């Protein structure tokens, strides 16, 4: 037990040095992490993101100090990093932060999402094992472990993803519950009457229960590994164990005092000095955590050597190295669409059809709207075909998005998902977290404006684009036709470290001769030009056709007009100033159009003499889409009035 107590003492020391932290779980869940790392987790100490490593997600991210001491004693985190817990150190941040070269498998903190990401990882292990079984069944035989707290299980998303794990029988997913019966403001029984055994068995899980003794946790994990279902292990722990706030809500977060160290030393019969521990502790963890990995890592290396000449090996390398250039470059032909002058969502179907082959590692998740959004590859699904690229998640948008993050974190697959734009709110917490981790997830949101029409204001998403565009590292594309759609799809497929969001229409839009897929990648470009224009009209998506209609009307009034298509306003604003000055003339007036509440358009005002913007700033109504659209001011007559005011 001395080595476990050393971990707990180091956690106390680091939290005290940081002037406070989540002591409760750091001590209570420590036996869970200790058991996992010293007896079960397989990984490659020299390759943190080894593709066949066991994954560990701290869904209850505030319990990070149950993990960091183990990594320190194993030689994977330095003493300096422990001394700077919470202050400028990615590897010992307050909540775990994923990085390409560290031993953290997911950034966590927003409760519930870690469980969803773990489900995504286990799901990816399942589909990759099936895809490469013919090459070797040992290529993807790892487990996914996730540590959850009571808060994780109270979040609604935990129900969404746990249900799906049961549906898909993800038997290599093992959840360990830090069940201490206490949370920050209350005891659990004050806010939850749930029987966890009933909950998880009803969802198709294996349920186990154990004490926090290392031997008991170890036995439960061994039993879970033999299950043909995902396993939920409820580990009965004690919050802030062996401190003055043991078993109390106040033990969730506090600054350890000398009395806490005295209580800890007395109860554990130890007398450690903060940040100074016997060499025997380091030796133990090196043997049990590091040296234990040599045999499985070497066996995997030898396996790959034997497979190098096999037909599937190149595909295996392209997938596991996330070589999107090899998989998707030059795969799309913008000219090959079933029908021109169509809704942009229809073009997505055309382009996905072009890459629907065995070499593609794209997997499509859909929230029960595949037929409406065209987010699908072929007509089968994972239930009927283990090699299918279509994963049904039901009406679980938030869960779907956390699973997408987990799949991207696992690696080996490209993942696309989406629904109607009005329901992007359900996914935003996961989009934000994925962007924070630089994950190349790909979202498609359709039914993008007032022109949804008869479904009414609940389905008319005037307010969604500004929220998506406000998230750092998210590229939002709103194309006006098939060429711009092809550019957005291609960019999203090739992206290595950015989240991409493609915004598509339900209503048909004209195919434009002047549009350009190459220029689209600049975020904006001149689609109809007049030198020294009197008026410049810039627009995105469905408003580009309106801008071109306005151009005709202005030409009749002898006003020289330039039209700029802006499929990605944030990307346009990131271009060099010299490029923006080519598009926008300082002697011209500028009208910008978008059926959205986005504010980014006002950043273009400094490049022109005068500017006004027509956006969408109120709920719509249940009516014909074009009627609603025009009622909100998106008609040539109203735009001419705006231009007249601008020119006055």
Curated annotation (Swiss-Prot):
UniProt binding sites for Mg(2+): 150, 180, 182
Source superkingdom: Bacteria
A molecular function (GO) term: transketolase activity
A Gene Ontology biological process term: pentose-phosphate shunt
GO cellular component: cytosol; membrane
Keywords, sorted A to Z: Calcium, Magnesium, Metal-binding, Thiamine pyrophosphate, Transferase
NCBIfam families: PRK05899.2-4, tktlase_bact
Complex and partners: Homodimer.
Protein name in UniProt: Transketolase
Lineage, uppermost ranks: Bacteria, Bacillati, Mycoplasmatota, Mycoplasmoidales, Mycoplasmoidaceae
